[in-house]
Amino acid sequence: MFIPLSILLLLGCSARINENRVAFDGFMFNSKLKVGLNKKDFEITVLRANRSLTGAKEAGRYEATIYCVNKFGTSDIAWILDPEDVSAVTSSNSIFIKGRCRI
């Protein structure tokens, strides 16, 4: 009885983790955010962007917005390398964007 209950609880936990993920253009993207010396500055790499360039751009924009809202309470971003300016996926199947949270 204990083992089936444990398995059921673990399955429920993994479902909760995945419910917070957002799909863009039908795909889930992993992003890496690096913060600059000035905490307002950030760089984002979106991995596996070869699946959908449009989706990867939106995933990067989403990650940036979440960062700025959580750190500074605003979604206003000054783009240094705007997602809209990204026209191709790199050889490592990723895209790179860069910006600054405006406060």
Task: Describe every region a protein language model picked out.
Residues 14-17:
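Bacterial signal peptide processing site
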